[in-house]
Curated annotation (Swiss-Prot):
GO MF: 5S rRNA binding; structural constituent of ribosome
GO terms for biological process, alphabetical: translation
Family the entry assigns: Belongs to the universal ribosomal protein uL18 family.
Listed name of the protein: Large ribosomal subunit protein uL18
Quaternary context: Part of the 50S ribosomal subunit; part of the 5S rRNA/L5/L18/L25 subcomplex. Contacts the 5S and 23S rRNAs.
Alphabetic keyword roster: Ribonucleoprotein, Ribosomal protein, RNA-binding, rRNA-binding
Organism: Shewanella sediminis (strain HAW-EB3)
Length: 116
């Protein structure tokens, strides 16, 4: 089993457990160049989203594939979710380690007011 397949299996397992809870989830995806985050409802509606591919986020950054960029995405997605009335979420790290950019995004979202 290769690295990507293992990550996707971990992600599927975590998503099934979150679906059983029936709560909104903060989903994180990362590539070498960008970081993406979405708040998704239990019925699969995207309530809020942010990424380093957006012009609004990229204007503040020098480079989009680092921890500082992930912090900006976390703050932005949390602010947008709170505007929609979402304050409590489950964190879906999509099988990625809770380290580096994923952890930075989560910490920034917590500081901006999301609870998980």
């Amino acid at each position: 089993m290769d690295k990507k397949t293992s990550r996707l299996r971990r992600a599927t397992r975590a998503r099934k457990k979150i679906q059983e809870l029936g709560v909104n989830r903060l989903v994180v995806h990362r590539t070498p160049r960008h970081t993406y985050a979405q708040v998704i409802s239990p019925d699969s509606q995207v309530l809020a989203a942010a990424s380093t591919a957006e012009k609004a986020v990229t204007e503040q950054l020098k480079y989009t594939g680092n921890v500082d960029a992930a912090k900006a995405v976390g703050k932005t997605v949390a602010e947008r979710a709170i505007e929609k009335g979402v304050t409590v979420v489950a964190f879906d790290r999509s099988g990625f380690k809770y380290h580096g950019r994923v952890a930075a995004l989560a910490d920034a979202a917590r500081e901006a007011g999301l609870k998980f």
